[in-house]
Curated annotation (Swiss-Prot):
Keywords: Selenium, Transferase
InterPro entries noted in UniProt: P-loop_NTPase, Rhodanese-like_dom, Rhodanese-like_dom_sf, SelU
Example GO BP: tRNA wobble uridine modification
Function summary: Involved in the post-transcriptional modification of the uridine at the wobble position (U34) of tRNA(Lys), tRNA(Glu) and tRNA(Gln). Catalyzes the conversion of 2-thiouridine (S2U-RNA) to 2-selenouridine (Se2U-RNA). Acts in a two-step process involving geranylation of 2-thiouridine (S2U) to S-geranyl-2-thiouridine (geS2U) and subsequent selenation of the latter derivative to 2-selenouridine (Se2U) in the tRNA chain.
Domain Rhodanese: 15-138
Gene: selU
Name by which UniProt lists this protein: tRNA 2-selenouridine synthase
UniProt subunit comment: Monomer.
Source species taxonomy: Bacteria, Pseudomonadati, Bdellovibrionota, Bdellovibrionia, Bdellovibrionales
Length: 379
C-alpha cells in the first residue's frame, strides 16, 4: 500500500485484505462504535480528552491544542508512540484514523514519522467512514434483491445459513450477537447499534463479489429488533418484502435443535462435560450455568402476559424442575419438556400469525436438507 492517505470509498479494499486500523480516539469514543477491524490506541485517554474539551469550549482551539501537547508529553508521549510503533511492526499495512481525520490523527501520524515509521490516515476519519458505511446499507437495500429464510423457531434457520458454503449469506444473528427471540441473549454482550450497522455494511461490501447467477443473498427472517439492536429501516423493508425459503421440520426435531443451542452447547451443557478441569474452572462454569437458568426465568416472566398466566406457570414449573435436575443429578434432558411447551404455546402461534399477516411469497418449503438442495440448484 502506498503512503497516500486513504479515502472512505477504499474501505472495501481494507476489509478484503483484513488490514487493521488504528483508532486514536479516546476509549469512550471507541466504545460507542468503531470501524470494523479497528484497534483502540488513543492519543489521549478519556480524562485528558475531557480536559482538552473543556478548555476548547472556554478558551478556544489554540489553548486546547497547547493543553493537549502538555498532557501528552514526555514519558506519556513515548509510551503512546511506542504502542503505535509496536502495532505497525505487527501490522505493517495499518491505517490511522480519529473522529474527523483532523488534529489527532495528523499529530499521531507526525509523531510516528518522527519515530521512523510512516503510515497513512483515513481522510475524514470515523465520521466520514460512518457516513460511507451507512450509504452502502441504503444503496444495497434499494438495488439488491434478497431471499428471506423463514420457518418456525427451532427449524434450524441459522445453522442452515451457516452451512451454505460458497453462497452469499448475511448472518444477522452473528452480527447482533443475539438469536432474535425473547430467550435469544448470547452469553456475551450485544454490540452497540453503531458497531452493528458498521459490521453489516462491511458484510455487504464483502458479499458483492459472491453474488452471481440466480442466487440472491440469503438472510434470516428477523424482526425489526434483534435483542436491543434495531435493523436499518431500508434494509428491514427489503428483507420483509423478499420471497421466502420456508424451512419446515417436525416438532421433535425443532425441540432437539433448541435444546442443543440453548442447553447442550451453552454454559449449562459445558459445565457437565467430562473434560478434566481445575476446581476453580468448574465453579466458574457452574455459576455461569446458574446465571443462564436465571436469565431463562426472567425471559419467561417477560412474556408471561402474552403466554397466558396458567401456561406461564406451567412452563416455569417445568423450567425450575429441569434446573433442579441439573443441580441434583447432572441431568439435562428434562429441559426438553419446557422447550416443547414454549414452542407450542408461544413461538408457533406468534410466528405463523406474523407470516399470515405479511402474505409472503414462498419460493420453497421443505426440511433443511431439502432447502439446501434447492439453494444449490440456483447457483
Amino acid at each position: 500500500m502506498s503512503l497516500k492517505n486513504i479515502k472512505p470509498d477504499q474501505l472495501k479494499n481494507l476489509f478484503q485484505q483484513n488490514i487493521p486500523l488504528m483508532d486514536v480516539r479516546a476509549p469512550v469514543e471507541f466504545s460507542q462504535g468503531s470501524i470494523p477491524g479497528a484497534v483502540n490506541l488513543p492519543v489521549m485517554n478519556d480524562d485528558e480528552r475531557a480536559q482538552v474539551g473543556t478548555v476548547y469550549k472556554n478558551q478556544g482551539n489554540e489553548a486546547a491544542v497547547k493543553l493537549g501537547h502538555e498532557l501528552v508529553s514526555g514519558l506519556v508521549k513515548e509510551q503512546r508512540v511506542a504502542a503505535w510503533k509496536s502495532f505497525v511492526q505487527a501490522h505493517p499495512e495499518a491505517v490511522f484514523y480519529c473522529f474527523r481525520g483532523g488534529q489527532r490523527s495528523r499529530i499521531s501520524q507526525a509523531w510516528l514519522k518522527e519515530a521512523g515509521v510512516e503510515r497513512p490516515l483515513l481522510v475524514g476519519g470515523f465520521k466520514a467512514a460512518r457516513n460511507y458505511l451507512i450509504k452502502q446499507i441504503e444503496e444495497f437495500s434499494v438495488r439488491q434483491e434478497l431471499i428471506s429464510v423463514s420457518g418456525p423457531t427451532g427449524s434450524g434457520k441459522t445453522h442452515f445459513l451457516r452451512g451454505l458454503k460458497g453462497c452469499p449469506v448475511i448472518d444477522l444473528e452473528a452480527l447482533a450477537r443475539h438469536r432474535g427471540s425473547a430467550f435469544g441473549n448470547w452469553e456475551v454482550p450485544q454490540p452497540t447499534q453503531v458497531d452493528y450497522e458498521n459490521n453489516l455494511a462491511r458484510e455487504i461490501l464483502l458479499l458483492e463479489d459472491k453474488i452471481h447467477g440466480k442466487i440472491k443473498p440469503l438472510v434470516e427472517d428477523e424482526s425489526r429488533l434483534i435483542g436491543r439492536i434495531s435493523q436499518p429501516a431500508t434494509f428491514f423493508i427489503r428483507l420483509r418484502s423478499s420471497p421466502v425459503i420456508w424451512i419446515d421440520e417436525p416438532l421433535p426435531v425443532r425441540v432437539d435443535n433448541v435444546f442443543d443451542d440453548y442447553i447442550l452447547n451453552s454454559s449449562i451443557g459445558k459445565s457437565l462435560e467430562a473434560a478434566p478441569r481445575c476446581a476453580e474452572e468448574n465453579d466458574i462454569l457452574r455459576a455461569q450455568a446458574l446465571q443462564l437458568f436465571a436469565r431463562y426465568r426472567q425471559s419467561l416472566l417477560a412474556i408471561q402476559r402474552k403466554l397466558g398466566g396458567l401456561r406461564a406457570q406451567e412452563v416455569m414449573a417445568d423450567l425450575e424442575k429441569a434446573e433442579l435436575a441439573y443441580l441434583n443429578h447432572a441431568e439435562l434432558s428434562g429441559n426438553k419438556v419446557w422447550i416443547e411447551k414454549l414452542l407450542q404455546y408461544y413461538y408457533d402461534p406468534m410466528y405463523l400469525g406474523s407470516l399470515e399477516r405479511r402474505h409472503v411469497t414462498v419460493l420453497f418449503k421443505g426440511t433443511r436438507f431439502e432447502a439446501e438442495k434447492f439453494v444449490h440448484s440456483l447457483t
